[in-house]
Amino acid sequence: MSLRKIIHVDCDCFYAAIEMRDDPRLAGRPMAVGGSPDHRGVIATCNYEARAYGVRSAMSSRHALKLCPDLLIVKPRFEAYREASREIHTIFRDYTELIEPLSLDEAYLDVSDSQWYSGSATRIAEDIRRRVARTLHITVSAGVAPNKFLAKIASDWRKPNGLFVITPNEVETFVAALPVARLHGVGKVTADKLTRLGIETCLHLREWSRLALVREFGSFGERLWGLARGIDERAVHNDSRRQSVSVENTYDTDLPDLASCLARLPELLDSLNERIARMDSSYRPDKPFVKVKFHDFSQTTMEQAGAGRDLESYRQLLGQAFARGGKPVRLLGVGVRLRDLRGAHEQLELFPPK
């Protein structure tokens, strides 16, 4: 089995965290993001105060209010969540391009070949958590392990706002005590069947031969045999093509005016050009853009087709973006949209010359 370094990052009650960040009045009271109880709405997520009452995701809003009469249910703002997710992925890409998103708030990262912190996956995970908290003012939990199966379990081990590491030497002991209900792919039906067979932990599961498990559970028995031993060879898949490359910085002190923002442009562009230089040849830089997040977390993005990637072009874009808010700035970003040359080539291949 190849030795890999996998991080699973999971935002803590993501939608609710964004709502509490943007409206501090929601913090400290039971709240949820979801649909109206009058229209058969469903809870998308809730904060930990609401979970203490038994409120859970996918529960009907009406039932949630019965459990917690003081529950405040707010409508989802998916664009705000998507934007936060994009910011988190921008942070991820500083450490690796091998990112497999599972949802807006959850992803696997393969940092096996990362040079950051001398290749320490634990320190990379710590840095990601620190940067997300500093930049987005929300918390994430992370798990570090030699494979995806264990990394996902690890990220849940010390939720919320926790980090748990399973080293290769700890795998056998850790997995042996693991309840089989925690195994990837084991739902209620399979868990109940395992219990009836007297299999409650992975140590019990190891007593069964591979053949016996296949006879009892079909092809899934093969996977159960491997998981009971901490084996999971699934790779971190990143099939999506990049749409842009960018760099951004959150400042410790808000930038008070346009002049102070413009003064930060050269260093941002230097970092952007370094990142562009590291891209593979299947991409070509296209439209430049700037991103401005104001002190109240409102934000805007300005881009222009046909503009250059020189300092003056970005100065003009930044001036237009700043004018939309005219308030102190907490974050500046610069980037460029990408043209996928590989995709264009493959599309042409579908229609060869006659």
Curated annotation (Swiss-Prot):
Site description Substrate discrimination, residues in chain: 15
Record domain UmuC: where: 6-187
Protein name in the entry: DNA polymerase IV
Signal peptide from the UniProt entry: none
Residues noted as binding Mg(2+) in the record, renumbered to the chain: 10, 105
DNA repair is among the record's keywords: yes
Domain of life: Bacteria
UniProt-listed Enzyme Commission number(s): 2.7.7.7
Transmembrane parts of this sequence: none
InterPro entries xrefs: DNA/RNA_pol_sf, DNA_pol_Y-fam_lit_finger_sf, DNA_pol_Y-fam_little_finger, DNA_polymerase-Y, DNApol_IV, IMS_HHH_1, Rev_trsase/Diguanyl_cyclase, UmuC
Subunit structure: Monomer.
Keywords of the record: Cytoplasm, DNA damage, DNA repair, DNA replication, DNA-binding, DNA-directed DNA polymerase, Magnesium, Metal-binding, Mutator protein, Nucleotidyltransferase, Transferase
SUPFAM superfamilies assigned to the protein according to its UniProt record, in alphabetical order: DNA/RNA polymerases, Lesion bypass DNA polymerase (Y-family), little finger domain
Cofactor binding: number and manner: Binds 2 magnesium ions per subunit.
GO-annotated biological processes: DNA-templated DNA replication; error-prone translesion synthesis; SOS response
Gene: dinB
Broadest EC class assigned to this enzyme: transferase
Record's catalysed reaction(s): DNA(n) + a 2'-deoxyribonucleoside 5'-triphosphate = DNA(n+1) + diphosphate
GO molecular function terms listed in the Swiss-Prot or TrEMBL record: damaged DNA binding; DNA-directed DNA polymerase activity; magnesium ion binding
Entry function: Poorly processive, error-prone DNA polymerase involved in untargeted mutagenesis. Copies undamaged DNA at stalled replication forks, which arise in vivo from mismatched or misaligned primer ends. These misaligned primers can be extended by PolIV. Exhibits no 3'-5' exonuclease (proofreading) activity. May be involved in translesional synthesis, in conjunction with the beta clamp from PolIII.
